[in-house]
């Protein structure tokens, strides 16, 4: 069975170390893989995976990715899911004036994000598709 993992720590965890200890406990209780909370900064994912390996976490940690599909998500998603937006993405996000702008940015950023994940050895990616199924379909085409 799969469990959740939080590269930027769960909002209720006092710190990342405690959150990772909790993930280790999940593994020790039989978890076979983990899917991360969404993130926009791949370095946070890779750092998390490295620390997990140092703690003896050996289950696959599948990155969870969500593209923006609407203008409102640019501000809502990072706040709701407690994830940081890299400066480069934030700089582009402020230029978005319409849902179409946000959707295009979401496809562009997420495609690049996935390409980097694959290039650095990630085998699987989980897409959070709520309000973004068309975007995810386009990203999948971009990755072919």
Predicted regions span which residues?
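Active-site pocket-lining/capping segments in soluble small-molecule metabolic enzymes
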Residues: 2-12, 50, 54-107, 112, ...
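A structural motif corresponding to the C-terminal end of an alpha-helix
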Residues: 29, 113-124
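Active-site-adjacent beta->alpha loops and helix N-cap segments on the catalytic face
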Residues: 13-17, 38-54, 132-143
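A cross-taxonomic marker for long C-terminal extensions/tails that follow the last structured domain
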Residues: 110, 118-119, 127-132
